[in-house]
Amino acid sequence: MKTTIILILLTHWVYSQNPTSGNNTATLCLGHHAVANGTLVKTITDDQIEVTNATELVQSISIGKICNNSYRVLDGRNCTLIDAMLGDPHCDVFQYENWDLFIERSSAFSNCYPYDIPDYASLRSIVASSGTLEFTAEGFTWTGVTQNGRSGACKRGSADSFFSRLNWLTKSGNSYPILNVTMPNNKNFDKLYIWGIHHPSSNKEQTKLYIQESGRVTVSTERSQQTVIPNIGSRPWVRGQSGRISIYWTIVKPGDILTINSNGNLVAPRGYFKLRTGKSSVMRSDAPIDTCVSECITPNGSIPNDKPFQNVNKVTYGKCPKYIRQNTLKLATGMRNVPEKQIRGIFGAIAGFIENGWEGMVDGWYGFRYQNSEGTGQAADLKSTQAAIDQINGKLNRVIERTNEKFHQIEKEFSEVEGRIQDLEKYVEDTKIDLWSYNAELLVALENQHTIDLTDAEMNKLFEKTRRQLRENAEDMGGGCFKIYHKCDNACIGSIRNGTYDHYIYRDEALNNRFQIKGVELKSGYKDWILWISFAISCFLICVVLLGFIMWACQKGNIRCNICI
């Protein structure tokens, strides 16, 4: 019985040696913010590392419509840009229009004399970048020919008509004299002249319209010359016509002279388009145009430009994210995430940052947990938190500044004759996209590595700052925790947090308590051994007492034991 009492007292003494439960000591642990479910990001050294927070850098969807702000967006409806420029009757509404972006619809069609443009893409690009269909008529003198030719394939209302910006010249009577007309450019801007040549469907039509069996058109300036002859022959019927018109264009610089020489088949200019330099463009899209604001437009619709990358469409207009092949790239905007462990030690110990993060700390990234005579508590360290946030906040903006294009990426078209150029251009574009995709992944991985390193460094700075303050008044318990060997109430804990702790005030008390506690302190491993040994001895003594009682009862005859074989 005495032995049992001694063991019970010993067990109580072991429990009483928990230094964190006394009034003369305190425990302070440093920790960092954690979340239950973090986000996986890629760094230089790890393919997947979990962080508390991350921002998606790739815009993968459009808003489904084209915003008419911040740019002047002109809906071409049933007209292509070239038809509007030539003056197709059903496109007269676009005369003298201006735009930042001209939208061509898949439903657009031509409704005049059938034509082709040998260098269609270049002309379309020149007119689109000019951003206007401003046209000025000039007084060309065409002597000895009939002007204003018309066709039943080109109706303006119910009457036969023709392209409003072109003048179809045919014979006058039985003659078609050689034409030689000049027009100087006395302006201080470039002039764009549109002209053409008619290809009759037969020799009979050729002589009927132009007398000569074969015509010729030569258009020249001081810098260039083009000579075109008609290709007479039947072609597939389009709007009742098997003939064709080929459209050409000439740019006349200030001080230069336009010269037109022809003996037949000439479709003459009526004036010029004023060329302007700018960043206007044209885009094919069937997305609806609506009232909204966006600085980036794609054929799929407008997209936000608050991300540095996008994989919506390679064709863009405006201030747009860089196109890459990846569907997702995440930029770490938080620290390394170590989800909090819920299991506590035998004495309810509080854990520090080495073991795990703290999910309950919502007002900061770094902080303190403490246990003292007044209980337990937690508080964030705002200074170290702000230091980390300041370094991370500018990352997204810096990445956007490095990658957002301040120009438009126009559509590129090539005729079948230029197939090899088209293949080369496609190869170059694909190579650029591959390079940017690789660079984007590398850039994000580098930034993520830097973010994780700097947040870890801030945690270590806070730990070292606390250790230097406490000095010999506390012992580093490992795992980011300190055992403080003096009475440290909440005000004392607050002074450690804000950096005003004076270790000299508590030095004598801490030194005295350290020696007293060290003299009787048993480490947690020995406490566990004592508990197990005392439990085993108690069980053994109970068994001995029970066996002795049985033997005593048998001797007195109070218990009979019969053994049958």
UniProtKB/Swiss-Prot annotation:
One of its GO terms (molecular function) is host cell surface receptor binding. Coiled coil: none annotated. The chain crosses the membrane at residues 530-550. A lipid is attached at residues 554, 561, 564 (S-palmitoyl cysteine). One of its GO terms (biological process) is virion attachment to host cell. Residues 17-529 are extracellular. It is a single-pass type I membrane protein. Disulfide bonds join 29-481, 67-292, 79-91, 112-154, 296-320, 488-492. Gene3D superfamilies: 3.90.20.10, 3.90.209.20. Residues 551-565 are cytoplasmic. Glycans are attached at residues 23, 37, 53, 68, 78, 180, 300, 498. One of its GO terms (cellular component) is virion membrane. It is found in: Virion membrane; Host apical cell membrane. Residues 1-16 form the signal peptide. Its main location: virion. Binds to sialic acid-containing receptors on the cell surface, bringing about the attachment of the virus particle to the cell. This attachment induces virion internalization of about two third of the virus particles through clathrin-dependent endocytosis and about one third through a clathrin- and caveolin-independent pathway. Plays a major role in the determination of host range restriction and virulence. Class I viral fusion protein. Binds to sialic acid-containing receptors on the cell surface, bringing about the attachment of the virus particle to the cell. This attachment induces virion internalization either through clathrin-dependent endocytosis or through clathrin- and caveolin-independent pathway. Plays a major role in the determination of host range restriction and virulence. Class I viral fusion protein. Responsible for penetration of the virus into the cell cytoplasm by mediating the fusion of the membrane of the endocytosed virus particle with the endosomal membrane. HAMAP family: INFV_HEMA. Major glycoprotein, comprises over 80% of the envelope proteins present in virus particle. This is Hemagglutinin. It comes from Influenza A virus (strain A/Equine/Suffolk/1989 H3N8). The lineage of its organism: Viruses, Riboviria, Orthornavirae, Negarnaviricota, Polyploviricotina.
